[in-house]
Amino acid sequence: MKEEDKKEERNKVKQRELTYKLIISQLFYDGHQTLAQELAAIVEQEAAAVSPSDRLMNIVSMGLQHEHEVERPLNRLEYTLGPGLDLEFETEPQTSAPEPAMYETAYVTSHKDKCRAAAFTMDGNLVATGSVDASIKILDVDRMLAKSDPDAVELHPDAVVGHPVIRTLYDHLDEITCLEFHPREQILISGSRDTNIKMFDFSKTSAKKAFKTLTDAEQVTCMSIHPSGDFLAVTTEGPVLRFYDISSCQCYVCPYPREHHTGPLTSVRYAADARVCATASKDGDVKVWDGVSARCVQTFSKCHDGAEVCSVLFSRNGKYILSSGLDSVVKLWELSTGRCLIAYTGAGSVGRQEHSAHAMFNHTEDFVMFPDEATTSLCAWDARNAQRKNLLSLGHNGPVRHMVHSPCSPAFITCSDDFRARFWYRRNVH
């Protein structure tokens, strides 16, 4: 560690000790002597050396008066959806986003076998689903909404002309495990148990086969595309994370075996700025990787008490990682400290979870969502305080194996072992 880093770390420790001292002083000042003494004992602060003081209250009051002056400007997406999840600034945030329990099924599409993969485009206008039958469907969101709403003829006169499924793609030999839309081009990328990653140009109506194939040595389980669209982070049934250069098809891995996971990988996600990406594994760990050097920079060990970690997802601002595990618990981790800030509990209380399932935020990051396997219902929590929200019956006749929320609208899709994918939407909201 550099000398500057050591000095900064010492300053942080001093500031934290001062913060605890101010809290204890404030508790004494407000008449909460017992609480003050208990906190002093926990943080090993000599209670007798702390005098009652209202200083903390005054500092907070001054800080709140000037807080808006230091907030960063919002980008275009944040102006539309709100700033997203940021526990540093928010105390009582207001949201216009609908509770997940208010969503309704707008369309159902069927495959010939279990459905276990889905993805939205960045603008939320298209969604793709993938199945164990090795087929992929691309569906138009406006057309799905028009099919389920008699009044939609006026709102979407062009949408009702055609069928919601605008493309069906066949070029894999085994289960489709993951799907990603390219952020800039009309390209859909698919991963499969046949060890291949394929790229489809869906701008051509006649194209059913891939124009490019990357062949791995192991079954592909998950992938995440770099925001630039130039690179692909890929996980397989093995413990080693791959980074593919899409144009050259070159594959890169971390050269240090001790930094790798020790079990099969289950999930990977880039942060929005692509400086880092996160992986989940059956070894029970979550790892954070440098997006340039491919080195592991952080490990969250046994995040779900040793249970398999099923999914990872970054918040929009990159400060937090949302993880889900086979223990049916969803957790919010602070990247800067490596601490679990919030545990979202209550799913899996009826029966033990057997299959991997993904947790997700809604489009505004006001809610955390996770499927309860035993009841085939959707559990939802307030993202900031883990308060339980109403359940939503998902209407599937088998486990929900994958879910993905639209990045910009109140819509999500559920994929189930009952061969179906359900498109959910909440109408008449901002």
Show which residues each predicted segment covers:
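Canonical WD40 repeat/beta-propeller blade segments in eukaryotic WD-repeat proteins
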Residues: 113-119, 174-180, 217-225, 262-270, ...
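Blade-level signature of beta-propeller repeat domains, shared across WD40, Kelch, NHL, RCC1
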Residues: 401-430
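Loop/turn segments within WD40 beta-propeller blades
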Residues: 118-124, 179-185, 223-230, 235, ...
